[in-house]
Amino acid sequence: MGASASMFRKGKYVTEKDLDVIIDIFTKMKFYAGGKDKEKLSTGESFSISFINDNWSRKWDDDDYQWDSFDYNDNIIIYFYPKPKESHEYYIPSMGETVPSYIIFEDISGRERLLLEFLHRYFKLFPEDVFMEEYLYTKDDIDKLYAKLPWNELWAYEDPKTF
């Protein structure tokens, strides 16, 4: 497994409606989800959702596909935590408190373009949230990076103060 990343929200913990918004963002980006696990949502257990786009599906279904021909920006897996976990709590300076992550993005390595597009859309709806890989990224950080073309493919591993 490669580098993972997390989302944080100050104050009231997230709900299923927040997950619906996240699924909707990916859908508008032409990604399709495996679906929510209603049973785990009701019990508060974490679960994963895979998002893939048509390009990935066509390659996967091709009889002659080569695993190394996949573009990692065509798929991503998230883990949603309906209830906060102490093991996922971090102190977020811009929030001034310790908060739990509610989404973990699995293996973001090679998925930086996909993630940047997602975060740009996400932060329009949730401007106070914070994204973290090695560094903490706010809406302002993502907006600066998104506006600067061509996109830096290694942005998720660099200090946002350098953008």
PLM regions: where:
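Acidic, proline/glycine-rich low-complexity IDRs
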Residues: M1-S4, R9, K28, R113-F163
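Short, extreme N-terminal segment that most often corresponds to the first beta-strand
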Residues: M1-S48, T162-F163
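Residues at structural and domain junctions
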Residues: F8, I104-F105
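Loop/helix-junction capping segments adjacent to catalytic residues or to phosphate/diphosphate-binding pockets
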Residues: E16, E112-R113
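Intrinsic disorder/low-complexity signal
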Residues: K17, D63, N73, P127-E128
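General "foldedness" signal
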Residues: L19-V21, I92, E133, K144
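Short, intrinsically disordered low-complexity segments
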Residues: K28-I104
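Exposed beta-sheet edge/beta-hairpin loop segments within beta-rich domains
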Residues: E106-G110
